[in-house]
């Protein structure tokens, strides 16, 4: 296949201007301080597509724009389009991504800026094919959403008013004519539902842009364009610190041996003094000084830094997250010429892969501690990245932390997150598995494409490598699995000649096995690299049970029963999941009362699974699992509730099984934590930040110390699982009772939970537990107590939920203020007459933060649930609604 056209010459103008700028006359180093002029305000945008303007003339006028931003959100702010997430608006708004757009800015430049030797226009991110001109002169053409574009601009700037124009081309319309002329099209992840691209001819694979924006099986197709990251003008005289990084070749309890590494751009040679100031989390700062000689061009500097008995950064649950601050400065004759700062935590990271009785391990070892990874996969927080605030990021990460997660996998079909995101992860002790941005498609064999990716990887690794939260760089998502197992790709491969198959796959192996690996090994050698997920680091086929990581989709994707999870024990489960709908309040944000049925056009539009095979595949799959496990939903609201119950209980089964098989299994990352829009998906937190039942379950099944009670083939294994680093004394109570609360049998045991291990306690057959009782009216409860306080509970059922003879629980409730918690603190007391399974508490339209939900309540038991709400007591009582399995199915 010939080279991709936009990669062969788009930066020629940029190169020429760069050479001219670097050959300019010298200026004193004393003027070298970097000056930054933000250029984020005052932008305007318009539709620059004559054909599209015929249908949308109002968009062809210049209007105010937001930078950073996207065309779609600018149109929304201008009230030129409706809410993209509402109803069927997705289909109505596809024209935006198929059109070209222009952004312009008038800005002033003062004489002091123009007197600087170096003046650069810096775009931190352009989405994606942009032609940039300054004062009517072409400056650059860009082709990668994930790269920073630093454009020498002095030759084109003038004193006073300047005009910057950015023309953005539709990535679909730009690439499609070229692709249609090629011998073949690489199979993409998902074909468009809207007819703008022929089936099997997806352009997304060829474009360095967030792949999810072309549509996924959990999100809409909104192909964005825009200036999606900040813009600024930078000026300096001869000297700029291009990069500053703290390497951590050795960190242990006794010493941290670090290296302050700088890359300095100098316009001419000369001497300077390099100072590195170290500010520990506690105690006095200290400074290291070294005299250096700089050559013209790029200079690599390194200063060893030794810290005795460092305060190390630990993952959540294993210790604190102290951060050190490092400041590097270059001075001459006491005058500071340039400086840079970094904050980082000191820790060691190992991806341990050792031969053992089950094959080869896959375990993250942080500061010498083997950490069982508990968490989820994370996708972008919105279809439109500029709407993602730091507050939304922090809220989502807090949701993960409050659910006892310690790791998130940042999936490769989105975009590299902002610095703020990783700062929050650092502070919360959340480990980050960071994919490079490849979402699951075979990639072009073009060498220019690979070079573009290499530059992208260098920039992103350099930007993010000082975050202690990042403990793995992974080449991408499901690329090898795609090549080996996906039906569409297998059919595509069969049409290629053997030579072309070899050429194409060899290029992909080079990208993930050499190019990206080489970038990480050079730029962040203290963090492991993993070629593709799932896989064994390209050492064999993907999807192996005894080596590497696994994506397990026989459940849901293959319609296997959820009990299949109990027979699946990979070394690390990095994807598995079940779908559900968000709660009714979230559904009301995109659907009206008339839409609340599964076959309505609106509900179909917000269910993306399996749409290529038909509009009802996803909802039919949900109904299949609900009916199999729980019965027939009695109405739409019950369907929504049961979808969450099914998801939560199914994922709990899998996660509990994986934790109970430690150290054979050392990771559980379910798919997925969050959403980009409101609709059916695998998430545990919906796009509004509301917790589904799964998130409440995760808080329990990911607890540092918990009990597992796993029943298969008529036998139940009960064990205590501990992620603590010290032994823990506990008591285990087993109680068998009928649904009316009559105790049939009880048992107790004292146990010392082994650290970082599973402690088996009981193995009981059904006959031993039931002793002749009706299995449809009997449950076994296992409770774990530490220092007399119940910290975990598991319920064992002897029949599927649909066969349980549940009665009306007879809920009794009491709402009382919690004087110790503040003005918005309450406690909700719930008591039942008979056993209540999967109790869901909601307050209708009121925003209420519940400390617990989605729980079982035994007959006669009163539970107290803390909550926070600003509503009045009357409103809370009026809107309180309790639901359970007993009243949600047709009986």
Model-predicted regions and their roles:
Residues 32-122, 198-230, 234-239, 354-358, ...:
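Extended carbohydrate-recognition surfaces in non-catalytic/accessory domains of CAZymes
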Residues 39, 46-48, 78, 98-240, ...:
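Accessory beta-strand-rich segments of carbohydrate-active enzymes
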Residues 77-109, 114-122, 127-134, 140-143, ...:
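Active-site-adjacent substrate/metal-binding segments within catalytic domains
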Residues 114-117, 157-161, 309-323, 768-778, ...:
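Short glycine/proline/serine/threonine-rich loop/turn segments at secondary-structure transition edges
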Residues 155-161, 261-355:
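Extended acidic/polar, glycine-enriched regions
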Residues 169-176, 332-337, 785-792, 887-890:
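Short acidic/polar inter-strand loop motif in beta-rich domains
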Residues 262-265, 599-852, 857-867, 876-879, ...:
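Carbohydrate-binding surfaces of carbohydrate-active enzymes
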Residues 407-427, 431-605, 646, 650, ...:
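Substrate-binding/catalytic cleft of secreted carbohydrate-active enzymes
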């Amino acid at each position: 296949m010939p080279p991709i056209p936009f990669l062969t010459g788009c930066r020629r103008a940029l190169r020429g201007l760069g050479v001219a700028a670097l050959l300019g006359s010298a200026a004193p180093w004393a003027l070298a301080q970097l000056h930054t002029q933000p250029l984020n305000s005052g932008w305007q945008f318009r539709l620059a597509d004559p054909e599209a303007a015929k249908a949308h003339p109002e968009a062809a006028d210049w209007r105010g724009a937001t930078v950073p931003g996207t065309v779609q959100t600018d149109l929304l702010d201008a009230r030129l389009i409706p809410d993209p997430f509402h109803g069927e608006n997705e289909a109505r708004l596809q024209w935006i991504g198929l059109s070209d757009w222009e952004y312009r800015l008038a800005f002033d430049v003062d004489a002091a800026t123009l007197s600087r030797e170096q003046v650069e226009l810096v775009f931190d991110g352009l989405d994606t094919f942009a032609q940039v001109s300054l004062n009517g002169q072409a400056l650059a053409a860009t082709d990668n959403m994930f790269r920073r574009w630093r454009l020498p601009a002095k030759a084109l700037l003038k004193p006073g008013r300047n005009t910057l124009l950015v023309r953005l081309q539709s990535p679909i319309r730009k690439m499609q004519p070229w692709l249609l002329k090629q011998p073949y099209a690489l199979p993409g992840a998902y074909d468009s539902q809207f007819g703008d691209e022929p089936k099997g001819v997806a352009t997304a694979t060829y474009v360095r842009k967030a792949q999810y924006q072309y549509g996924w099986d959990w999100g809409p197709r909104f192909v964005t364009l825009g200036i999606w990251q900040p813009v600024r003008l930078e000026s300096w005289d001869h000297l700029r610190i291009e990069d500053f990084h703290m390497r951590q070749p050795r960190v242990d309890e006794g010493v941290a041996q670090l290296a302050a590494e700088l890359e300095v751009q100098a316009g001419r040679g000369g001497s300077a003094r390099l100072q590195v100031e170290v500010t520990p989390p506690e105690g006095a700062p200290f400074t290291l000084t070294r005299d250096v000689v700089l050559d013209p061009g790029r200079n690599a500097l390194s200063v060893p830094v030794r810290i005795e008995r460092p305060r190390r950064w630990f993952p959540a649950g294993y210790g604190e997250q102290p951060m050190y601050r490092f400041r590097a400065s270059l001075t001459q004759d006491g005058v500071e010429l340039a400086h840079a700062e970094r904050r980082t935590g000191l820790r060691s990271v190992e991806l341990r892969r050792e031969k053992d009785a089950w094959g080869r391990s896959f375990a993250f070892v942080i500061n010498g501690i083997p950490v069982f990874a508990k968490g989820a996969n994370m996708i972008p927080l919105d279809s439109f990245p500029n709407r993602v605030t730091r507050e939304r990021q922090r809220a989502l990460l807090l949701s993960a932390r409050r659910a006892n997660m310690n790791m998130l996998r940042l999936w490769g079909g989105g975009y590299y997150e902002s610095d703020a995101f990783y700062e929050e992860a650092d502070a919360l002790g959340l480990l980050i598995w960071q994919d490079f941005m490849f979402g699951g498609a075979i990639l072009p064999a073009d060498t220019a494409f690979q070079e573009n990716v290499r530059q992208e990887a260098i920039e992103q690794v350099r930007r993010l490598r000082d975050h202690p939260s990042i403990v793995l760089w992974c080449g991408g998502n499901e690329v090898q699995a795609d090549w080996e197992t996906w039906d569409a790709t297998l059919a595509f491969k069969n049409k290629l000649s053997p030579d072309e198959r070899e050429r194409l796959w060899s290029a992909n192996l080079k990208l993930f096995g050499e190019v990206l690996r080489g970038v990480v090994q050079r730029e962040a050698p203290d963090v492991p690299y993993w070629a593709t997920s799932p896989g064994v680091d390209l050492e064999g086929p993907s999807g192996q049970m005894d080596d590497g990581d696994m994506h397990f989709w026989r459940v849901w994707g293959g319609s296997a029963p959820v009990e299949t999870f109990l027979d699946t024990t990979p070394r690390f489960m990095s994807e598995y999941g079940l779908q559900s709908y968000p709660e009714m309040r979230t559904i009301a944000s995109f659907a009206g009362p008339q839409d609340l049925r599964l076959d309505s056009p609106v509900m179909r539009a917000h269910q993306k699974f399996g749409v290529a095979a038909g509009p009802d595949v996803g909802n039919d799959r949900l109904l299949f699992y609900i009916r199999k496990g729980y019965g027939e939903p009695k109405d739409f609201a019950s369907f929504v509730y049961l979808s969450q119950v099914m998801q939560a209980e199914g994922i709990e089964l899998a996660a509990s099984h994986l934790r109970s098989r430690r150290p054979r299994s050392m990771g559980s990352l379910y798919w997925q934590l969050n959403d980009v829009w409101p609709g059916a998906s695998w998430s545990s937190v919906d796009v509004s930040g509301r917790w589904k039942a799964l998130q409440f379950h995760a808080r329990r099944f990911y607890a540092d110390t918990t009990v597992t009670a796993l029943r298969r083939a008529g036998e139940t294994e009960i064990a205590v699982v501990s992620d603590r680093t010290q032994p823990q004394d506990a008591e285990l109570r087993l109680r068998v009772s009928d649904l009316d609360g009559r105790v049939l049998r009880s048992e107790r045991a004292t146990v010392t939970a082994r650290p970082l291990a599973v402690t088996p306690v009981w193995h009981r057959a059904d006959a031993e537990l039931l002793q002749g009782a009706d299995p449809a009216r009997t449950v076994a409860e296992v409770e774990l107590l530490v220092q007399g306080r119940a910290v975990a509970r598991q319920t064992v059922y002897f029949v599927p939920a649909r066969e349980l003879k549940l009665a009306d629980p007879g809920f009794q409730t009491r709402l009382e203020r919690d004087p110790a918690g503040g003005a918005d603190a309450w406690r909700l007391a719930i008591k039942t007459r008979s056993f209540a399974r999967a109790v869901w508490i909601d307050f209708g339209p009121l925003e209420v933060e519940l400390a617990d939900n989605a729980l079982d309540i035994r007959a006669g038991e009163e539970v107290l649930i803390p909550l926070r709400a600003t509503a009045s007591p009357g409103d809370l009582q009026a809107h309180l609604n309790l639901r359970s399995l007993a009243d949600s199915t047709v009986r």
